[in-house]
Every structure is written in C-alpha cells, then in structure tokens.
Amino acid sequence: TGRSRFLQVPFRLKCKDWLAGTKKGYHKDVYSEHYVPVEEVHDTIEERISEYRNQGKKPYFIQGGGHGNAGTQSYVDAYREIAAQEEELGMRFSHVFHATGTGSTQAGLVCGRELERQEQGERSGNRIVGISIAWPCPRGRDVVKESILDYYRMRRQQNPGQKLPEFCEEDLVFEDGYRLGGYGKSS
C-alpha cells in the first residue's frame, strides 16, 4: 500500500520453550508473523503476548529498535570494544558519530564512555555525537537523556553499592540538523 498511513508493518514474535528436566537446555523456537497497519502494531503485540501467556508460554518482548535497557547495555558493551580498539591501535578517536533514533545507541555509548572514564580515572575522551534520524530537539535529546538516567537507575538497583557516573548535560551531543523534514522523507 505504499507510504500511506496504512503501511503494513511486519513484526515477528519469538518464544523459546524450555523443556524442564534436561541438562542441555533443549529449546524449540516458535515464530509468528503478522502484518498490520502501523497504528495497530502496539495493540497487536499486546494481544499476541497475552495469547502466548494464556497458552502457558513466557514471551519476552524486546522493544522496536532495541529501545530500553537491553539495547542500552548492548552499546555500553560496544563502547568497551571501541575503547579496546583504541588501546590496540595506540590512538584515541576524537569523536564517535552514529545515527540516533530510539535513543538506546547513544545512551549506551555515552554510558559506556562514562563508565570507562570512571574506571580509568580520566575525564577526557571522545565526543559521542548522535545524528538524529527521527526526532527533533528537544524531544529526541530528552529521549536519549531519559534512557541514560533509566540505565543508571537500573544499575543502581542491581548493584546498590556501585559508584556510577553522574549525568552531565554537556556529555549529550544530539544533532537534529540533518533530518530533512523527518524520517523516511526524501530531499
């Protein structure tokens, strides 16, 4: 149906059924694909999750674009890889540029850099620059900031005694000047 409001959005729900009592952790992957108009995606996902639960399954839903702490943690780990590569190459990158949409990539890179700085005892380092593919400022920047703060809240709950970096406004560089009218629009 083209680029109308009736654009069909595919999504895939995956459930793993673990067979209790086995040493190997046998599992069976179960997939279900549905195509719905974009405005029905949220409700359809909720309905399918409810159906799986009613069948005795235990679905785990990862938000689109990896938004949330699982996605943020992935990019905390990615930043550690960047730092390891800098060490291996004997150089420091002055900037890390990336596309930012749901906020998890940028939140993870910023948190990863701050955790690395804290561990290394330094305040210098590269700038993480998110180039917005979706939201204008301040909305997009606020989404990234909330993802950073939410990630630190989660870490504090998991490890109450762990010292974590404080969020610093200047560490969040969000550029929205390249959106050209918004996501999916041609120039």
Language-model segments: which ranges?
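Gly/Ser/Thr-rich loops at beta-strand to alpha-helix junctions
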Residues: 1, 68-69, 98-107
